[in-house]
Regions:
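Sec-dependent signal peptide recognition
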Residues: 1-8
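Short, low-complexity N-terminal intrinsically disordered segments enriched in polar/charged residues
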Residues: 9-51
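Hydrophobic pocket/interface hotspot
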Residues: 36, 48-49, 57-58, 73, ...
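A mature extracytoplasmic/lumenal domain signature
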Residues: 53, 64, 96, 110-111, ...
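Structural motif
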Residues: 54, 100-101, 131
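A short gly/proline-enriched turn/hairpin at secondary-structure junctions
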Residues: 57-68, 81-85
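Surface-exposed, charged secondary-structure patches
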Residues: 74-116
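Short beta-strand edge/turn micro-motifs at domain boundaries
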Residues: 121-143
Length: 143
């Protein structure tokens, strides 16, 4: 009986610990998006880009095809959203977030950009990777 009780305690402790890790990581990932949203709404592409992994392996896929590398993704944003009017006001709706592994997560959501002349909206899929305790976007598919 004692063995069964100890076994049960070990299993439930491990499950609770795993849930806490998942919740903590989910909050960190959502914080990356919130930081990006605030940076965007302050018209700060440099700060917005901090949510992306600064690597040549970063990929952004949009309607014009993929763009590889942090610097090229940044240039794409600067060219596409070259003024405060074009950037507008950004908001997100998160549809789903789940951990694929301890260091990889997938987030599905919708973006809305309110501008004076026209609004934009679409969907995105982000792949996050945990590096040295921090979560970064390594792949962004936005349409």
């Amino acid at each position: 009986m004692i063995r069964i009780t100890i076994f049960f305690l070990l299993i439930t402790t491990n499950i609770i610990y795993s849930q806490n890790i998942a919740e903590r990581d989910s909050l960190k990932i959502l914080n990356v998006l919130e930081t990006q949203r605030q940076a965007w709404n302050n018209f700060d592409i440099d700060e917005f880009m901090q949510g992306y992994l600064k690597s040549d392996k970063l990929v952004f896929s949009g309607s014009n095809g993929p763009v590889y590398g942090w610097n090229f993704v940044k240039v794409r944003y600067l060219n596409t959203y070259s003024s405060n009017e074009l950037m507008g006001y950004l908001d997100f709706e998160i549809n789903d977030l789940f951990l694929i592994s301890k260091k990889v997560a997938l987030l599905l959501g919708k973006f809305n950009i309110e501008r004076d002349n026209e609004n934009l909206s679409g969907y995105f899929t982000l792949v996050f990777k945990k590096i040295k305790g921090n979560w970064y976007i390594v792949s962004d598919h936005t349409s």
